[in-house]
Structure formats: C-alpha cells, structure tokens
Design a protein with these regions (language model features):
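Short acidic/glycine-rich loops and adjacent helix/strand connectors
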Residues: 1-174
Length: 174
C-alpha cells in the first residue's frame, strides 16, 4: 500500500502464499502452446476466477490491517498474473488472469488493469509501467540515463534529455 506524491511512501504491506492448486493451474496454463487469448479454455476461466477472488481477499485483508476503508484508496493497480506473453508473434498479445472489473466491483476501489495488452495494442512490447515510473522519479533534464530492471523479464528504460522516454523488454531476468 503506497502513498505517491513527489515521492513514494510505503504505508503497509500484506502477502499470502498462493494456494498450491491455483499455482499448479497457472504453471500448466503457461505451458499451453495454443493462444489462450483468442481461444480461452475452461481451465483458464477457472484460474482467472480463483486468482481474482484471491486478489480481492488480499486487498480486503490489507485494508483491515491498515485500518483503512476502500474510500480511503484512490486507485488499485492490478497487474494480474501473466499466463502467456507473446508481444512479437504474428498476432501479438499478453494474457493475464485477475479480472480488474470484478476486483473493482468486490472491493469498491477503482481498479486499473490490462496494462500489458493495452501497451501491445499501442505498439509496445507489453512493459508500460516501468518506463513511466522511471520517467517520473528518475528523469534529469541535464543527463541521459539508462535504467535496467531485472525481474522475471528484464527491461530497460532510456531517459534521454529532451527526448521521449522509451523502454522495452530485453529477455529473461532472475
């Protein structure tokens, strides 16, 4: 839980272990060769529903732990869980489970999601958040900067003075 102004302040955090059955379902779905974005399966819909409800429960527990109401929260960003990420295929797509509309309805908090798919539709490689974050907090009008973010998928952001910020995935990370 963050408060973001011209700096980021961590208010609180809460995590739970992913239920093993759900984790196993997600791993199996990620191994599927078929385009699940165009051809969703019953298993995908079930995993999406389970992950969505797990997310809602974590949000509610975090609010309770923090002694906050949903009306105290401006917005919730939900990346979801990536099942397939194919930004460079003939028909580029990225598929995450965790339905932001249902999360919003059940928490009463405006929920923003589908970051990767929206970025791909607009010509990106599906990693839109890190460049925006880096631009806001690390841009310097007098210096060029390159920031490398090593996660499951590594990405790079170029902050070039007097030019538009650009960023992209570079490949596997940790």
């Amino acid at each position: 839980l963050l408060k973001i102004t011209n700096k980021i302040k961590v208010i609180n955090s809460y995590s739970v272990k992913m239920p093993k059955t759900l984790s196993n379902k997600m791993v199996e779905l990620s191994k599927t060769k078929k385009n699940l974005f165009l051809y969703p399966t019953k298993e995908l819909r079930e995993a999406d529903e389970e992950f969505t409800f797990e997310t809602v429960n974590v949000v509610k527990k975090l609010l309770k732990k923090s002694k906050l109401r949903n009306s105290d929260i401006h917005a919730l960003g939900s990346h979801g869980q990536t099942i397939q990420h194919r930004p460079f295929s003939k028909k580029p797509y990225s598929l995450q489970i965790g339905n932001p509309k249902i999360i919003s309805n059940l928490t009463g908090i405006t929920t923003i999601g589908n970051f990767r798919q929206t970025n791909i539709k607009n010509g990106g490689s599906g990693a839109p958040l890190t460049p925006s974050f880096h631009n806001f907090f690390l841009r310097d009008k007098t210096k060029n900067r390159a920031i490398i973010n090593i996660g499951g998928i590594t990405n790079i952001t170029l902050l070039l003075k007097n030019k538009k910020t650009i960023g992209w995935d570079t490949g596997p990370g940790n």
